[in-house]
């Protein structure tokens, strides 16, 4: 069981790094994407090709963007990643991405929630 969870965490982190940090979305899907991708982000249609195009556009608008992985949690076929995102020219972001993987460790489903890190907070805690 532990090997399965560690493999899934590794696959998701490598997928995310290729997609976001290295700007190699097509390679990320080739290595880690399943036969289908069910997308729950309302701004992005289902399927690898639409996500690849979405990330190509993001690369042009935010060159030098960077994702830092804060926490990674795996249970069953799900991996949850807490991410600190640097957006050049914009405020940083905090996000939670949830991935479902198939039995072969390939990514087949994705959810995310994102928010901007505010300049001031009502408490002394960080978002990370």
Task: List each model region and its residues.
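C-terminal and inter-domain tail/linker signature
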Residues: 1-128
């Amino acid at each position: 069981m532990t090997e399965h969870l560690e493999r899934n965490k590794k696959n998701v982190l490598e997928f995310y790094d290729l997609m976001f940090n290295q700007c190699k979305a097509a390679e990320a899907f080739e290595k880690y994407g399943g036969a289908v991708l069910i997308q729950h982000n309302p701004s992005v249609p289902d399927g690898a090709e639409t996500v690849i195009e979405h990330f190509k556009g993001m690369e042009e608008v935010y060159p030098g963007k960077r994702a830092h992985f804060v926490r990674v949690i795996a249970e069953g076929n799900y991996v949850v990643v807490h991410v600190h995102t640097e957006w050049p020219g914009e405020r940083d972001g905090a996000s939670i991405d949830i991935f479902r993987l198939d039995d072969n460790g390939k990514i087949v489903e994705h959810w995310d929630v994102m928010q901007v890190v505010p300049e001031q907070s009502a408490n002394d805690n960080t978002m990370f």
